[in-house]
Amino acid sequence: MQLVLAAKYIGAAIATIGLIGADDKTSNM
């Protein structure tokens, strides 16, 4: 249960960070 919530939360956070800091952090991967 917690894994699903954590995965969803982390996924949203990564998506937001990716959208916001796309230019700043190109070498995220």
From Swiss-Prot:
Gene Ontology molecular functions: lipid binding
One GO biological process this protein is involved in is: proton transmembrane transport
Q: Which GO terms describe its cellular component?
A: mitochondrial membrane; proton-transporting ATP synthase complex
Q: Does the keyword Iron apply?
A: no
Q: Which domain of life is it from?
A: Eukaryota
Q: Where in the cell is it found?
A: Mitochondrion membrane
Q: Which UniProt keywords apply?
A: CF(0), Hydrogen ion transport, Ion transport, Lipid-binding, Membrane, Mitochondrion, Transmembrane, Transport
Q: What is its main location?
A: mitochondrion
* Purpose of the protein: Mitochondrial membrane ATP synthase (F(1)F(0) ATP synthase or Complex V) produces ATP from ADP in the presence of a proton gradient across the membrane which is generated by electron transport complexes of the respiratory chain. F-type ATPases consist of two structural domains, F(1) - containing the extramembraneous catalytic core and F(0) - containing the membrane proton channel, linked together by a central stalk and a peripheral stalk. During catalysis, ATP synthesis in the catalytic domain of F(1) is coupled via a rotary mechanism of the central stalk subunits to proton translocation.
Q: How does it assemble?
A: F-type ATPases have 2 components, CF(1) - the catalytic core - and CF(0) - the membrane proton channel. CF(1) has five subunits: alpha(3), beta(3), gamma(1), delta(1), epsilon(1). CF(0) has three main subunits: a, b and c.
What family is this?
Belongs to the ATPase C chain family.
Protein name per the record: ATP synthase subunit 9, mitochondrial
Q: Which organism is it from?
A: Wickerhamomyces pijperi
